[in-house]
Amino acid sequence: MFTTSSRCSSLKRGKKTEGISAYSSSRCSSLPRNGIGNPYHPPTAPTQSESESEVPTHSSVRPSNAMVSLARRPLSAAVPAGNLLGIHLFRCPDAVGIVAKLSECIASRGGNIHSVDVFVPDDKPVFYSRSEFTYNPRLWPRHELHKDFLNLSRCFNAQTSTVRVPDLDPKYNISILASKQDHCLFDLLYRWQEGRLPVHINCVISNHDRPQDNHVRRFLQRHGIPYHYLPTAPANKREKEILELIQGTDFVVLARYMQILSENLLKAYGKDIINIHHGLLPSFKGGNPSRQAFSAGVKLIGATSHFVTPELDAGPIIEQMVERVSHRDTLQSFVVKSENLEKQCLAEAIKSYCELRVLPYELRKTVVF
């Protein structure tokens, strides 16, 4: 059994160990839960796999930087019968032997690592990793799994150490805030209905009223999801009521909610809030970014999903998507193209977050595995 008193065994980067090929590289290949972007709350995430013979060695990069990158394969194909998939997200000061001790922790319980992604920045000795592994829950009960990874985190003074077992752990409980435009909201509801978003929707909150026969209201009623209409005014953003409704959720999604959340609400909530901005940040912040982009004569437009911080449209970016435009495009075609990008971008950011692919990196950045 792994304990905190165990001496952290060493692993020379660039050498192969137990089916994992470690090598030096500053590139980051490519999964998040809990407290990833909120400045008042820390985060989490998972990984992938492939045979060690397919992992190249980059000798030109100095050995202090490391990445273990194993190509993805379908998770269903990677989980033997009777076993479960586990995902581990890790952030700690860089040190020799982290991957070796991670492998030892899992292997000592009969588990098998299927993929590991590691990133160490060029200019900062911080170790980021996401791992996917399979294990037999009869041999490694969930509470023991949690305890072993807690010991691992203590061994390396980790800032983040999150382990998630999707088939055992509850789905993320979320609330969605939206305004008049509902293309992002309805897209999320449709993906949720299709089983493509691993979340439980606690409620939908809007500052725009929708009649009972509205397609969104009918969908919510059919699926038993509460809808709360909270009209806002400059002097009253209804944040007390919003806070009461979102308490108990794991994170909140702003699906084109056209109100600025105060710093007091962010502090009181204390968890991550994911926003979609209909522009390619950091350009075209604030209102009407499509018109700003059209007036600037850009050749690419985009959408940005990011964590909400007190500074408007300045939180760490999770996902961005772009599409080419030309002199033939009109302002209306900019808007139509942007809406398609917004739906995809927001859904992808939520999926990455739920799959433990996101970690905070410096003040305004993220590592997205």
State where each predicted segment sits.
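N-terminal mitochondrial targeting presequence
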Residues: 2, 7-8, 13, 22-23, ...
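Eukaryotic intrinsically disordered, low-complexity regulatory segments enriched in serine/threonine
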Residues: 12-14, 44-50
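Residue-identity detector for glycine
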Residues: 14, 19, 35-37
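Intrinsic-disorder-associated, low-complexity terminal segments enriched in Asp/Asn/His/Tyr and depleted
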Residues: 23, 38-41, 58
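Low-complexity, intrinsically disordered Ser/Thr/Pro- and acidic-rich segments
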Residues: 36-38, 49-55
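Short glycine-/aliphatic-rich beta-strand segments at the starts of folded cytosolic domains
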Residues: 81-92
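Short amphipathic alpha-helix segments
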Residues: 95-115
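One-carbon transfer enzymes
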Residues: 119-369
